Amino acid sequence: MRLTAKQVTWLKVCLHLAGLLPFLWLVWAINHGGLGADPVKDIQHFTGRTALKFLLATLLITPLARYAKQPLLIRTRRLLGLWCFAWATLHLTSYALLELGVNNLALLGKELITRPYLTLGIISWVILLALAFTSTQAMQRKLGKHWQQLHNFVYLVAILAPIHYLWSVKIISPQPLIYAGLAVLLLALRYKKLRSLFNRLRKQVHNKLSV
């Protein structure tokens, strides 16, 4: 039984709630002492993990729609991607304002360059910014074939973001390893497309070097 357009609309409502409720919980936890001994780190890790969850959910949609024969599921992919960007922006903002402080924002650029795991994080965020900005149908029509080329960079984020998470924790725990494993699994499901993209990129580089 395939999903109807009305059911997908209700699914989108549920997904919006899934994006909003963690934020409401975080606000409650901040105001009622629900965080741990280092609340700044807790906020950073919570926002980062939530962004990663939405990234993984975004990557899951295409194979799920194909294997479950639910083509209308694709309509939820943009929504999930935008929530991923929103939480990634909260993650970056929490680091800039809470870790560095308002008076030390000038150090942000230096921090992003001198700390490799932060470099991976900001590269991922910039890609997500570009994908969010060009996610509308109007931008898709305007960019034409280049739109898909740009949005294929989500696979790079799927590689960089888990590495950023693993690199940022001082003690390796099961949680970041689980996220990394899920990312690898989802990328493996897109193996044929990734191989095609890699071969195309290699051919383009070879052609440019041959000129």
Swiss-Prot record:
The chain crosses the membrane at residues 10-30, 45-67, 82-102, 116-136, 150-167, 171-189. It comes from the Bacteria. It is found in: Cell inner membrane. Its cofactor is FMN; heme b. Binds 1 FMN per subunit. Residues 1-9, 68-81, 137-149, 190-211 are cytoplasmic. GO terms for cellular component: plasma membrane. GO terms for biological process: protein repair. Residues 31-44, 103-115, 168-170 are periplasmic. Disruption phenotype: Cells lacking the msrPQ genes display no visible growth defect. Keywords: Cell inner membrane, Cell membrane, Electron transport, Flavoprotein, FMN, Heme, Iron, Membrane, Metal-binding, Transmembrane, Transmembrane helix, Transport. The keyword Cell inner membrane applies. The keyword Transmembrane helix applies. It is a multi-pass membrane protein. One of its GO terms (molecular function) is oxidoreductase activity, acting on diphenols and related substances as donors. Heterodimer of a catalytic subunit (MsrP) and a heme-binding subunit (MsrQ). Belongs to the MsrQ family. NCBIfam families: PRK05419.1-1, PRK05419.1-2, PRK05419.1-4. Part of the MsrPQ system that repairs oxidized periplasmic proteins containing methionine sulfoxide residues (Met-O), using respiratory chain electrons. Thus protects these proteins from oxidative-stress damage caused by reactive species of oxygen and chlorine. MsrPQ is essential for the maintenance of envelope integrity under bleach stress, rescuing a wide series of structurally unrelated periplasmic proteins from methionine oxidation, including the primary periplasmic chaperone SurA and the lipoprotein Pal. This is Protein-methionine-sulfoxide reductase heme-binding subunit MsrQ. It comes from Escherichia coli (strain K12). The lineage of its organism: Bacteria, Pseudomonadati, Pseudomonadota, Gammaproteobacteria, Enterobacterales. The gene is msrQ.
